[in-house]
C-alpha cells in the first residue's frame, strides 16, 4: 500500500486530505511543518503533498531540499491556495512536480496521485 506524506501548517487541511487519502487506501503520514518532515526517514514514502505557503519555508524550498539534500525522488504535489504562481511554476517544471489548488477536490486529488504513482 503506497505511503503518502502530507505537509501543511493547517490542521483542517491535514485532517481533510488525510481522510480522503485513507479512504482511497493509502497509508498517510501528516506533519505540520517542513522541519518535522526533514526528521523523517523518507525512504518508504511513495508521494509527498506539500502546502506551498507555510510560515517556516515555502513549498518550493521544501521540494528543492528534498530533491537535492535528502535525495528523495518521490512524486511531489503542491497544494496551494496561492493565485500568483509565477515563482512556483518554474520549480514545479524543473523537478517534475504537480500543482493542486485549494480547496482540494477529493476526486482530483486521488486521480492526480494515482497518475503520479503510475509514472
Q: Model segments located where?
A:
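Receiver (REC) domain active-site loop signature in two-component systems and cognate sites
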Residues: 54
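His-Asp phosphorelay/catalytic-motif detector in bacterial-type signaling
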Residues: 44, 70-76
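Active-site residues of response regulator receiver
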Residues: 51, 80
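C-terminal output helix
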Residues: 95, 104-113
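Short acidic/polar segment at the start of the alpha1 helix of CheY-like receiver
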Residues: 10-14
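Acidic, metal-coordinating helix/loop segments flanking the phosphotransfer/catalytic sites
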Residues: 30-47
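Charged docking surfaces used in two-component/phosphorelay signaling
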Residues: 15-19, 23
